[in-house]
Amino acid sequence: YDLLGTEEGVQRAFAKLDTIKDHVVWWEAGAQPPQLLADGEVSMTITWNGRIFNAIAQEKQPFGLVWDGQIYDLDLFVIPKGSKNKEAALDFIRFSTDTKRLADQASWIPYGPLRNSSIPLIGTFHSDPSIKMIDHMPTTEVALKNALQNDFEFWADNGEELNERFNAWLAN
């Protein structure tokens, strides 16, 4: 983000995009990337891991995941100051972030649990016990080795301008 936050960095990014523009298939809906792969229209894609997992586990597509260089986000819980329902909100947060509950959730969809303590408890896919869900989690130590955390502050400060510039580039 340090380099992308400079004009030189933005110019370098767009210069790189210029070199691949004619070879990129842009998608707009999450169902598109697995279909583009299945149809042979693309040889690789960026997408949500749950979509690719579904194609692998339920549609038996011969896809794989590469976590190296993944970009990940964080989700947060917030209780507004002065909330009349503070105790209920705290109860919900305790319930929804329970270590075992998060591990159980991972048997349905491979979205990494927010507690590291859940990772050793992750089992198999709810409808196919031969599928070890840990192999599909983005939050294992191996998967996170070269990951980049999305910088919310950077995008709050620069997102609008970069999106406008990207859309103008895309239109040309």
Regions found by a protein language model. Name each.
Residues 20-24, 41, 56-59, 96-100, ...:
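Sec/Tat-exported extracytoplasmic proteins
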